[in-house]
């Protein structure tokens, strides 16, 4: 077995400097008789293979900043689920001394001590991470052990409510439902065997088995990654900043493809619509109440009238949904898409049990027969998505339903919620593959949808997955949260933790899902206000309390209606953040510590976040709040609602609150684009564009961008079929200069010219003239809302408004 218990040798420190003790001074130990020793090495095209007295170890650089380390490389192992291209490797430089090997990809370097065997990792000359006793095999588990540095903060582990810094915690690596959670949970639906360090590295335990992560809980300076079985590999990624770290990480684990634009619109959802009549009435209610709507989501009643006994039917209950194809076609004409829930379980009482058995689609018991077991919904089995037969059978069902008009898919219970340990899948038993089940399900469905509709982006919402599942378009949510203030308060932490490790579209059941005897009106309003400024706007909950805003009282509707419409007006901003996520992995929701990477205290903040490039959002998560303390980073900020200017040295701002809005700040130098509100994204147009610029002398140079395409084509970026509007503002003592340009080949339906209004906030009254590409226009001093001038200045609001047409040509606007 692999085992090493030893300190670092003096020779190592002489060769590679004295930075190693910054990990903390390891206790010097005698070399253990089971220690691993180097025997020889071979540099191959696929990496460096080191032979030791206990087997082979393979090191592969996946990029200049990412390395995969596979122990027991000479034995048969499960494939990597985390890596987007597990077989690829880049060439790296190898140097050797008598006692050490140095293997470098560029940004990241592995330094290998031969006797006893040990690997340490450097970013340039800075020690990032070192194995303590490397890889170990015990009778009941395998594990890796690494040193933690003094003061090092650790994020990660996926969905947990433990505080942002997870150091000092030990928790299971086993996806499991936590029904009705509130403000604490150590084990939830979607865990991740990965961490992000304040030293700006990400470490992934590329193992799908049941296990645990111990982040300095048992031993304060030791990180231990454990699993019952499975792949003995880890991936280390380095960066020079948090954004570059995320970019490097998603380069090797895969980037989230752009979702369809409609995924960013308004959803109607509950548990659940029990009939076609109720579903139609809900869509009509949105129209009657003048609320935008893009999607209606059908929970499990679409295939059976009861919660129990029907799972696995995977076909319409014609008694309660007599004309589902007509229903979906009617919705489509109104710009409303239909999303159906599916689960991976097939009950013995369902219509498809015999067919699934005949098709060999189900996982097996140890005797090779279809495994049946008890779950909440009845007795049944689980589809083996790891087998060709199971994938083929499940895919054919999705194909048939998609042909009928289903526009997107909701995959529920994919932890899996029930997964007996003696269940046998095609590639391993339940405990070995458990955490990769949702990942493989998403991969299968994503490929099936692209094969069937190569010109459309799939919509796949799932409750569980693995590191890298984002590359299959997975849109996860945070599960069955309780209808409590604690449930709402936990959502920022959950979203940020998942977003940092690739899942930019993580979101919650707005309003809460579980329990609650009656509606808490204030909490509901606050949750749906928060929802406007997070990735997916989807109210959802048990149906004894209506989830949808259209079924609330008049005051609630009056508060929420303009906010939902605002989200539609802000779609260019939200969609551009989605584009950035696809391009670089940058999350849509971003933590405050991105603003000051040298301030580790910001890592602990879980009350506020950046929404896209320019907005700082602070949800209200307590009842009766009259003012909120906002940890605004140093600089100039503007109140999004009132336009008030604030300057802070980094001390928190205290803002009064009311029931109509939550605190949102805009950073100085921000460009905020808007389009006219529509009732569905099918009517989305950007031929009329409003751009708000928040001017301030503290920002002499500002840049922004707006990404536009057809909202559907999965290859729009690859084919350059988009319109990227770039914006730059240069501020001097007596002039403000804007440069506007467009790049990209364009897309079907793209406006050649846009009627553009540029609104400059905090504008000086010194400007008298506007030059547009050399043509001079006098600036009128008037109320811009009632003055049809091409350029006007509103003294009371301190806003300057410019109206012009923006075609394909670049524009230079100069205020003087």
From Swiss-Prot:
The active site is at residues 412, 415, 480. Keywords: Glycosyltransferase, Signal, Transferase. The keyword Nucleotidyltransferase does not apply. Residues 1-24 form the signal peptide. Its EC number is 2.4.1.161. Gene3D superfamilies: Glycosidases (3.20.20.80), glycosyl hydrolase (family 31) (2.60.40.1760), Golgi alpha-mannosidase II (2.60.40.1180). CDD domains: GH31_N, GH31_transferase_CtsZ. It catalyses: Transfers the non-reducing terminal alpha-D-glucose residue from a (1->4)-alpha-D-glucan to the 4-position of a free glucose or of a glucosyl residue at the non-reducing terminus of a (1->4)-alpha-D-glucan, thus bringing about the rearrangement of oligosaccharides. Pfam families: DUF5110 (PF17137), Gal_mutarotas_2 (PF13802), Glyco_hydro_31_2nd (PF01055), Glyco_hydro_31_3rd (PF21365). GO terms for molecular function: carbohydrate binding; hydrolase activity, hydrolyzing O-glycosyl compounds; oligosaccharide 4-alpha-D-glucosyltransferase activity. GO terms for biological process: carbohydrate metabolic process. The keyword Transferase applies. Acarbose binds at residues 299, 417, 463, 480, 540. It is an enzyme of class 2 (transferase). Alpha-transglucosylase that specifically transfers single glucosyl units from alpha(1->4)-glucans to the non-reducing terminal 4-OH of glucose and alpha(1->4)- and alpha(1->6)-linked glucosyl residues. Acts on amylose, amylopectin, glycogen and maltooligosaccharides, with the highest activity with maltotriose as a donor, and also accepts maltose. Does not act as a hydrolase: weak hydrolysis activity is only observed on the disaccharide maltose. PANTHER family: ALPHA-GLUCOSIDASE, HETEROGLYCAN GLUCOSIDASE 1. Belongs to the glycosyl hydrolase 31 family. This is Oligosaccharide 4-alpha-D-glucosyltransferase. It comes from Cellvibrio japonicus (strain Ueda107). The gene is agd31B.
């Amino acid at each position: 077995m692999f085992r090493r218990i030893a300190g670092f040798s003096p020779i190592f420190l002489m060769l590679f400097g004295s930075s190693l003790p910054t990990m903390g001074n390891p206790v010097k130990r005698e070399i253990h008789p089971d220690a691993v020793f180097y025997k020889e090495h071979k540099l191959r095209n696929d990496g460096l293979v080191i032979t030791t007295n206990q087997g082979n170890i393979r090191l592969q650089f996946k990029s200049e900043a990412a390395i995969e380390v596979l122990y027991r490389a000479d034995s048969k192992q499960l494939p990597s689920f985390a890596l987007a291209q597990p077989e690829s490797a880049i060439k790296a430089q190898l140097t050797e001394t008598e006692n050490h090997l140095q293997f470098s990809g560029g940004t990241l370097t592995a330094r290998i001590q031969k006797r006893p065997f040990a690997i340490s990792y450097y970013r340039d000359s800075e020690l990032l991470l070192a194995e303590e006793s490397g890889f170990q095999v015990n009778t009941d588990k395998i594990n890796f052990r690494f040193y933690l540095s003094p003061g090092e903060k650790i994020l990660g582990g996926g969905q947990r409510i433990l505080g942002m810094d997870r150091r000092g915690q030990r928790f299971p690596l086993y996806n499991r439902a936590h029904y009705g959670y509130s403000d604490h949970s150590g084990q939830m639906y979607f865990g991740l065997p990965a961490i992000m360090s304040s030293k700006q590295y990400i470490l992934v335990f590329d193992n799908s088995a049941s296990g645990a992560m111990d982040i300095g809980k048992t031993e304060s300076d030791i990180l231990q990654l454990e699993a019952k079985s499975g792949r003995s590999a880890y991936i280390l990624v380095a960066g020079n900043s948090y954004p570059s770290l995320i970019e490097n990480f998603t380069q090797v684990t895969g980037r989230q493809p752009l979702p369809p634009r409609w995924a960013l619109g308004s959803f109607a959802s509950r548990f659940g619509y029990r009939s076609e009549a109720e579903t139609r009435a809900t869509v009509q209610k949105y129209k009657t109440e003048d609320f935008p709507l893009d999607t209606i989501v059908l929970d499990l009643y679409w295939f059976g009238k009861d919660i129990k006994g029907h799972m696995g039917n995977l076909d319409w209950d014609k008694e309660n949904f007599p004309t589902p194809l007509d229903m979906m076609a009617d919705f489509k004409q109104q710009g409303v898409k239909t999303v159906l829930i599916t689960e991976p379980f097939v009950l013995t009482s369902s219509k498809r049990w015999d067919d699934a058995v005949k098709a060999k689609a189900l996982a097996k018991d140890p005797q090779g027969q279809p495994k049946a077991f008890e779950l909440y919904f009845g007795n049944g089995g689980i589809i083996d998505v790891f087998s060709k037969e199971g994938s083929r059978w499940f895919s054919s069902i999705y194909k048939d339903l998609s042909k009928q008009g289903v526009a997107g898919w909701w995959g529920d219970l994919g932890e899996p919620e029930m997964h007996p340990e003696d269940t046998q899948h095609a590639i391993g038993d339940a405990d070995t593959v458990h955490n990769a089940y949702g990942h493989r399900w998403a991969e299968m469905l994503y490929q099936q949808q692209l094969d069937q509709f190569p010109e459309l982006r799939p919509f796949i919402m799932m409750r569980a997955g693995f590191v890298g599942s984002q590359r299959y378009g997975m849109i996860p949510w945070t599960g069955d949260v309780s209808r409590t203030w604690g449930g709402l308060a936990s959502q920022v932490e959950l979203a940020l933790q998942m977003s940092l490790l690739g899942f930019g579209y993580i979101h919650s059941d707005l309003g809460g899902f579980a329990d609650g005897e009656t509606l808490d009106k204030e909490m509901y309003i606050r949750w749906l206000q928060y929802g406007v400024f997070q990735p997916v706007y989807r109210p959802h909950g048990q149906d004894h309390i209506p989830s949808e805003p259209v079924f609330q009282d008049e005051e609630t509707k009056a508060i929420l209606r303009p906010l939902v419409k605002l989200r539609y007006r802000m779609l260019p901003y939200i969609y551009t953040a989605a584009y950035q996520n696809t391009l670089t992995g940058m999350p849509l929701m971003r933590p405050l510590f991105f603003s000051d990477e040298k301030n580790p205290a910001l890592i602990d903040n879980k009350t506020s976040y950046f929404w896209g490039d320019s907005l700082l959002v602070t949800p209200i998560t307590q009842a009766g709040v009259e003012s909120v303390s906002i940890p605004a980073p140093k600089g100039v900020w503007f109140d999004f609602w009132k336009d008030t200017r604030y300057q802070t040295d980094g001390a928190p701002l205290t803002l009064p609150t009311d029931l109509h809005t939550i605190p949102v700040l805009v950073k100085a130098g921000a460009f905020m684009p808007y389009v006219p509100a529509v009732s569905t994204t099918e009517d989305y147009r950007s031929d009329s564009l409003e751009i708000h610029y928040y001017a301030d002398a503290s920002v002499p140079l500002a840049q922004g961008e707006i990404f536009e395409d057809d909202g559907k084509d999965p290859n729009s970026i690859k084919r350059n079929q988009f319109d990227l509007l770039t914006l730059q503002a240069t501020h001097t003592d007596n002039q403000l200069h804007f440069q506007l340009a467009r790049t990209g080949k364009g897309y079907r339906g793209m406006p050649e010219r846009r009627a553009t209004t540029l609104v400059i906030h905090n504008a000086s009254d010194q400007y008298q003239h506007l030059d547009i590409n050399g043509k001079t226009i006098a600036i009128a001093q008037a109320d811009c809302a009632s003055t049809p001038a091409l350029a006007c200045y509103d003294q009371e609001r301190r806003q300057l408004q410019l109206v012009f047409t923006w075609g394909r040509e670049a524009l230079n606007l100069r205020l003087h």
